[in-house]
Amino acid sequence: MSFNIDEWEPKTKMGKLVKEGTITDIDEIFEKGLPIMELEIVDALVPDLEEEVMDVNLVQRMHKSGRKVNFRVIVAVGNKNGYVGLGQGKAKEVGPAIRKAVDNAKYNLIKVRRGCGDWGCVCGKEHTVPFKVQGKASSVSVSLMPAPAGVGLVVGDVGKTILNLAGIKDVWSQSFGQTQTTVNFANAIFDALKTLSAVKASEADLKKMGVKY
């Protein structure tokens, strides 16, 4: 169902500022480090998000009333132009689990720092990671490295999906640990992307690496 801002009744101050048009860019929220408390904020400011179901898994646990079975779903969302999110959802049925995962992915949305960081590429476009970065989740660790334009995404399928949704087209990678575990590999990739924005660099260095922000 498409989002209709006119039907939205914001419950938070931030939501009201978005609906009235005072906040028109999600970067204003990210720059202040404010948490997103309403999904409609993301729907209004980043309306072109795409969704990809990464994994559907059956999870069982013992309860005093018997064995409980839930579906655990991992979903990635992104606009293929610098914004991506990853979320997990659990429910007794697949449909509700997917919806929960999509919602959580939107709450976890981040802006991804992109650039042209490979020394052999001088295109100046935002097609790769601007510098080497590492991410970790449980036993899985991943390194993402700048690659020249045209190389493509040299990473596992889970990583390709997330990086593609983030708008990264070229990357070299190394991974260690139980990378066949989708949830951990996906979280490690996402952790690496979050680290991109956390690394401090001078404006001059960022300009050299083709970073636009």
From Swiss-Prot:
Entry GO terms, CC: cytosolic small ribosomal subunit
PANTHER family, per database record: 40S RIBOSOMAL PROTEIN S2 (PTHR13718:SF4), RIBOSOMAL S SUBUNIT (PTHR13718)
Functional description taken from the UniProt entry: With S4 and S12 plays an important role in translational accuracy.
UniProt comment concerning the protein's domains: The N-terminal domain interacts with the head of the 30S subunit; the C-terminal domain interacts with the body and contacts protein S4. The interaction surface between S4 and S5 is involved in control of translational fidelity.
Residues annotated as domain S5 DRBM: 49-112
UniProt-recorded name of the protein: Small ribosomal subunit protein uS5
Transmembrane segments: none
Keyword Ribonucleoprotein appears in the UniProt entry: yes
Signal peptide from the UniProt entry: none
Matches recorded under Pfam families: Ribosomal_S5, Ribosomal_S5_C
One annotated GO molecular function: structural constituent of ribosome
Keyword Ribonucleoprotein applies: yes
Subunit details: Part of the 30S ribosomal subunit. Contacts protein S4.
The family this protein is said to belong to: Belongs to the universal ribosomal protein uS5 family.
Keyword list, A-Z: Ribonucleoprotein, Ribosomal protein, RNA-binding, rRNA-binding
Lineage start: Archaea, Methanobacteriati, Methanobacteriota, Methanomada group, Methanobacteria
Species name: Methanobrevibacter smithii (strain ATCC 35061 / DSM 861 / OCM 144 / PS)
One biological process term in Gene Ontology: translation
